[in-house]
Every structure is written in C-alpha cells, then in structure tokens.
C-alpha cells in the first residue's frame, strides 16, 4: 500500500496537480496552494492507483457497502474506478437537482437502507461531501464511510467524524508536501 501511495503522490507531483500561488477554494477559504486531482484522474494508471488504494483501505478497515457514490465533478471518475474495482454499482450526486426531466439530484439507483461508500477527490472543510451525504440520506441510504484521495487537513476530518461518519483519507496533505520535499531534495543532489 505504501508503495502504491508513493507512486500516486509522485504522479500527482509530476502532473502538476499541486499548484502554489493564491487560490480561493470551494469552501471559500484562501490558500497558498491548490490540489487539482482532476489533473491526474485523466491518467488511467493514477486512476487505477486511486481505486486500488481506496478499495484496499475500505477492506482493511472492514467497511461493508452496497454502492459507491461520488459528488460531481471531481469525484465522478474516482468513484467510477472504485465501482469497477469493487464491482459495486455507481451513484453520481449532482450539486443541484436537474432543472429538466426528472429533476433528480442523483444518477443511479439508491434504495432504502443501501450502505454507501462516498468518495471525494479533495476535502478541506468537508462541506461539499457532507452535502452529498445529506442528499443520499434523504433517499434512505446510509453512509458506510467517506473516502477521500487527498485531505487538506483543514477541518474536514473533524466535521465528518462529528456527524458520525467514518473518514478514510488515502493521502493527507502533510504526506504529499513531505514527499514533494523529499523528491525535490533528491533532484538537487
């Protein structure tokens, strides 16, 4: 698992998924760095690593689930890869209900009592993924766990666990930044 995690971090660094400068995050917070996992989900090897790491983490912790869900847009490819890896059906959670057709806020089937593994690309405060959890729970589903590729370590874990959810970060930003410094140090030798 550690080797796969390091390979994923390396792919993130190589793809330019970590940017430095001034950014406003979806939470409204300002940051001097931005993690754009969307830059790396277009790499099939990185996507496979993400799916394998999430599936392995969930299995090790002993989480049982019936479906994999991801909020649009960033988590959809990751949730799809986890769905393929685990053989569990996929559910996509829209930010807002469609303004046409059925007006649904989800794509895919959710039944009363379904245990959902909710997947997210990056968490800061946890607000976006918690809104997705509310949508799924309003349909009678239960959140088995929330797995995230990168946790920025800015409050998401506390927000998510305070609601009673199991929080499973694959990579914490401190690990990512530490790896960046290690790689940078090797390159300057």
From Swiss-Prot:
Keyword Transcription: no
Record's keyword annotation contains Transferase: yes
Positions contributing to 5-phospho-alpha-D-ribose 1-diphosphate binding: 94-95, 98, 120-128
Any one Gene Ontology molecular-function term assigned to this protein's record: magnesium ion binding
Taxonomy, superkingdom: Archaea
EC number from the UniProt entry: 2.4.2.10
NCBIfam families reported for this sequence: pyrE
Protein name per its UniProtKB record: Orotate phosphoribosyltransferase
Organism: Thermococcus gammatolerans (strain DSM 15229 / JCM 11827 / EJ3)
UniProt gene name: pyrE
């Amino acid at each position: 698992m550690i080797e796969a995690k390091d390979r994923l971090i390396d792919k993130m660094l190589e793809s330019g998924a970590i940017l430095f400068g001034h950014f406003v995050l979806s939470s409204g917070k300002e940051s001097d760095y931005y993690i754009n996992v969307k830059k790396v989900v277009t790499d099939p090897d990185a996507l496979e690593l993400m799916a394998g790491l999430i599936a392995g983490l969930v299995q090790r912790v002993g989480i049982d689930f019936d479906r994999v869900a991801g909020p649009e847009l960033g988590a959809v490819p990751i949730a799809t890869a986890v769905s393929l890896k685990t053989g569990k059906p996929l559910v996509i959670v829209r930010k807002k209900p469609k303004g046409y057709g059925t007006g649904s806020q989800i794509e895919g089937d959710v039944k009363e009592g379904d245990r959902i593994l909710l997947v997210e690309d990056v968490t800061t405060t946890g607000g976006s993924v918690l809104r997705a959890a509310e949508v799924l729970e309003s349909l009678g589903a239960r959140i088995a766990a929330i797995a995230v590729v990168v946790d920025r370590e800015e409050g998401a874990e506390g927000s998510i666990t305070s609601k009673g959810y199991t929080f499973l970060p694959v990579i914490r930003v401190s690990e990512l930044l530490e790896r960046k410094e290690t790689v940078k140090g090797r390159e300057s030798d």
